A protein has these predicted regions:
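Gly/Pro- and small hydrophobic-enriched strand-loop and loop-to-helix capping segments
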Residues: 131-148
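Conserved alpha/beta-domain cores
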Residues: 1-121, 127-129, 141-143
């Protein structure tokens, strides 16, 4: 989830942003990205299983957002990013189906190539369901110490 007050820094310094979940955030990133820079790669964050504790747009908003965001200059909308509830393996299949369904709404469908889902504990199931990018921080660095 990207906050409005962080977009300028992200637009100037990064090549990828995974937490775009609203049109206003994409518009800000687009307007703040330098013309001289490569387009900013973004993934639309989707709350695939409706968790109250998670950010992301609703699945029913995705087609419209893909249509709108894929037309913005200086951005390259690459795909979806989802973080389902633990042990909700059905959400991976739901995300894959949504990813395929909304491709036709993309202004540049050849850019639509990234389904970011799965973490250290469920990466095998995510990859089996079609994930092209996984987050493996725990596998690399160990579990977080929340007591600090």
């Amino acid at each position: 989830h990207v906050q409005r007050n962080k977009t300028k820094h992200l637009a100037e310094k990064f090549a990828w942003v995974h937490g775009v979940d609203r049109l206003i955030i994409a518009e800000r990133l687009s307007s703040q990205r330098l013309d001289s820079a490569e387009p900013l790669n973004i993934c639309l964050q989707v709350n695939i299983d409706g968790q109250d504790s998670k950010d992301g747009c609703a699945p029913e908003e995705v087609a419209t957002l893909v249509e709108q965001i894929s037309q913005l200059p200086r951005l390259r909308l690459r795909g979806l990013m989802v973080i389902p509830a633990p042990n909700n393996l059905k959400a991976f299949a739901d995300a894959q189906a949504l990813f395929e369904q909304v491709k036709e709404h993309h202004a540049h469908p050849d850019d639509w190539d990234t389904l970011s889902m799965g973490m250290s504990g469920d990466l095998e199931a995510a990859v089996a369901a079609g994930s092209t990018m996984v987050r493996v921080g725990t596998a690399l660095f160990g579990a977080r110490d929340y007591q600090k």
